[in-house]
Amino acid sequence: MNDELAEAVEAEYTSLSALRIRMWAHREHSEFPDDVEVNVRAESDLLARHDVLDVGFGTGDFLKNLHAAGHSGRLVGVDTSESAVADLRGHPGVDARLGSATDLPLPDDAFDRVCARYMLYHVSDPSAALREFRRVSRDGGVTVVVVNHADVVPGVMGMVREEVERHVADPGVRAVNSVHSDNLPDLMGAVFRRVRVRRVDNSLVFHEPAQLLRFAGAVTSMCGMRPDAPERDAVIRSLTTRISSWFERNGGPWRDPKGYSICVGDR
């Protein structure tokens, strides 16, 4: 199962296109204004002099934005995606490395702040990853982990799962494990001296069918369909029909609850 999860995550992030679409949706279609990066910086008491590690950095925007804002401490990112590392490598002021969260290619006691945003639910052994985060943080350091609520955007996820199960003869392992807002505090409490939690609730709101379809197509791998699956076109056609019919009947908007937690662990 662990190998299957790792393979599903690797396939998902061979390209960053689906990730960028999901980020677009949360940035442009959240019901209430919200900036996760701002919240992470605030909850971690991040200072410009801090040495920062971002694990599972994805597009690298968090580190790029810190550098652009004049951050003076070291900025290091580790990701399992070769595409992500290649995209960030060479960016001024940022050290991008290929590596696993459960075996970080970094020395002990190296960072003031360790950040892991929206990635722990992609890891085969979350507890091992948390122990690694603690290992590379300094005395007095802080680790900030962000994960989604347990049943995020249930409307669109349920619809996509139904179509994947209907069209794909042998759905694969979803590219996520079972870590979420409700169980992360206990996982971190077993590793860190003290854990603080901030929950953020919101919704995704789509006013047009094309907006919802774009997002739905970007979460298919989270529902067991590989990005290169031959059934992908059939799934997208069915989703197009269902989404168009829903808007014809209801007029919109499509509103789906979502949320996340920021858990801060003190070393």
Regions found by a protein language model. Name each.
Residues R113-D125:
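A short SAM/SAH-binding and catalytic strip from SAM-dependent methyltransferases
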Residues T102-R113:
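A short acidic, Gly/Pro-enriched loop at the edge of an enzyme's catalytic core
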Residues L53, T59-D103:
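Class I SAM-dependent methyltransferase SAM/SAH-binding core
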Residues P33, S178, N183-R267:
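Conserved Class I S-adenosyl-L-methionine
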Residues M1-L47, D61-N65, V144-R166:
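Conserved class I S-adenosyl-L-methionine
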Residues S127-D139:
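A short glycine-rich, Lys/Arg-flanked "PGG" loop and its adjoining helix->strand segment in the class I
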Residues D51, G141-V142:
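Short glycine-centered segments of the SAM/dcSAM-binding site in methyltransferase folds
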